């Protein structure tokens, strides 16, 4: 039988390594960085994209380097739908998108995403809903049903029609091939006013305008400017038909796995950054509209806004029928409209 003799010096060396191992492991753990991929489809240069850029830097700095956040705007990591799905799965830790995306999984919170149209009166109404009890409740529901926490709400403002031909009343929208998000509630809305809604991915709008697949789209002024859609369509009709809040979506499993101080940092810094984003968005909307005018876009006001509201009013009952909770949410939102 072979004998295995270990010298005294070798034994001391081995012992030293064993003793040092916990310290080495601890040092490695302390140096390990927590990846946070922030990906979305908002336009480069928009107030919302700038807010995510600011938040990325803040997370990196305030975490002392423990969080390694990286920002991927304008669809760099996939389409809107892909970003939402990857966020739910945890492959993308943070994204943004309207609560209307939850039309199927949680219709009661889709109402806070502007569904079913003309539900928000103005910015003050939006704040009463999302910065109060309803906003917090919506986040809890999203967490339970989708695995994503809404840590705050950014915004891009009210949406309007950008088209290749003039639209100033409900008769002129008849048959208009307009791009809409790939959600039933949006299709239903535009059918009610007589348009021809065409569901398409967000990133395909420029090419769809250029090829004639669509005649129009609907969006906020910042996106119209940022994605240069005005190069293909020169008529902007101020309809304010939809206000789409941009929920700041954080994967709940990722968030829960963070140390307590970093969880607090993520939530608190989001509130700080996106409060300023909302202020900036509202302060710059009029300026951005003037820039669109200067680029050659003609701006119109609806001459018959009450007819649009009347044509889509039945959507409230139809959407409310999805569940008692959905009806209750719509009633609460409308009840906060003010005088």
Give each language-model segment a name.
Residues 2-25, 31-128, 134-136, 140-339:
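N-terminal secretory/targeting leader peptides
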């Amino acid at each position: 039988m072979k004998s295995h003799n270990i010298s005294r010096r070798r034994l001391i060396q081995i012992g030293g390594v064993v003793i040092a191992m916990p310290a080495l492991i601890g040092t490695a753990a302390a140096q390990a960085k927590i990846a946070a991929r922030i990906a979305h489809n908002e336009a480069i240069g928009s107030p919302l994209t700038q807010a995510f850029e600011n938040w990325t830097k803040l997370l990196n700095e305030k975490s002392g380097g423990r969080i390694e956040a990286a920002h991927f705007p304008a669809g760099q990591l996939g389409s809107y739908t892909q970003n939402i799905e990857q966020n739910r799965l945890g492959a993308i830790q943070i994204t943004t998108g309207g609560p209307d995306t939850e039309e199927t999984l949680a219709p009661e919170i889709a109402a806070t995403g502007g569904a079913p149209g003309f539900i928000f009166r103005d910015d003050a109404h939006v704040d009463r809903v999302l910065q109060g009890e309803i906003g917090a409740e919506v986040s809890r529901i999203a967490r339970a049903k989708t695995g994503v926490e809404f840590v705050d709400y950014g915004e891009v403002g009210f949406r309007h029609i950008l088209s290749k031909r003039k639209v100033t009343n409900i008769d002129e929208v008849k048959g208009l091939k307009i791009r809409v998000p790939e959600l039933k509630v949006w299709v239903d809305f535009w059918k009610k006013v007589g348009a021809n809604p065409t569901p398409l991915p967000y990133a395909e709008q420029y090419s769809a305008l250029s090829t004639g697949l669509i005649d129009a789209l609907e969006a906020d002024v910042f996106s119209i400017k940022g994605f240069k859609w005005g190069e293909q369509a020169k008529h902007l009709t101020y309809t304010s038909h939809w206000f789409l809040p941009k929920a700041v979506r954080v994967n709940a499993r990722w968030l829960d796995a963070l140390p307590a101080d970093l969880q607090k940092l993520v939530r608190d810094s989001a509130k700080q950054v996106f409060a300023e984003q909302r202020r900036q968005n509202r302060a710059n909307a009029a300026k951005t509209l003037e820039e669109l005018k200067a680029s050659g876009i003609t701006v119109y006001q609806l001459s018959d806004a009450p007819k649009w509201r009347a044509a889509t009013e039945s959507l409230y009952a139809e959407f409310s029928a999805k569940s008692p909770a959905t009806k209750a949410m719509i009633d609460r939102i409308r009840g906060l409209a003010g005088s």
